[in-house]
């Protein structure tokens, strides 16, 4: 798995957990919907930490909580 895939999966997990659809999350996070859609489709090579921060702020979670997932286990990443 690539980092961008882990980010996409984590955002989907959090959308499910907090009952957000991606477009609403984008709107509430002040992220252009096209940017979030591209991130979720794995079309963004290096997802922006700033956009992840804005998502975390909207969901009222820390960056630590965002990345505290087995998805971000370095052993699972392809280079």
Regions found by a protein language model. Name each.
Residues 43-57:
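Short, basic-rich loop-to-helix N-cap that marks the start of a DNA-contacting helix
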Residues 25-26:
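Short alpha-helical "recognition helix" segments of helix-turn-helix
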Residues 12, 16, 41, 71:
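Residue-level detection of the helix-turn-helix DNA-binding "recognition helix"
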Residues 30-47:
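Recognition helix of helix-turn-helix/homeodomain-like DNA-binding domains
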Residues 1-21:
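A short, Lys/Arg-rich alpha-helix, primarily the initiator
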Residues 1, 38, 67-79:
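Short, charged recognition helix plus adjacent turn
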């Amino acid at each position: 798995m690539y980092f961008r895939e882990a980010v996409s999966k984590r955002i989907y997990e959090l959308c499910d957990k907090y009952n957000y659809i991606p477009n609403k999350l984008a709107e509430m996070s002040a992220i252009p919907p096209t940017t979030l859609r591209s991130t979720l489709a794995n079309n963004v090579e290096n997802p922006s930490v700033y956009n992840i921060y804005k998502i975390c702020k909207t969901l009222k979670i820390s960056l630590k909580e965002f990345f505290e997932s087995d998805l971000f286990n370095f052993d699972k990443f392809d280079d």
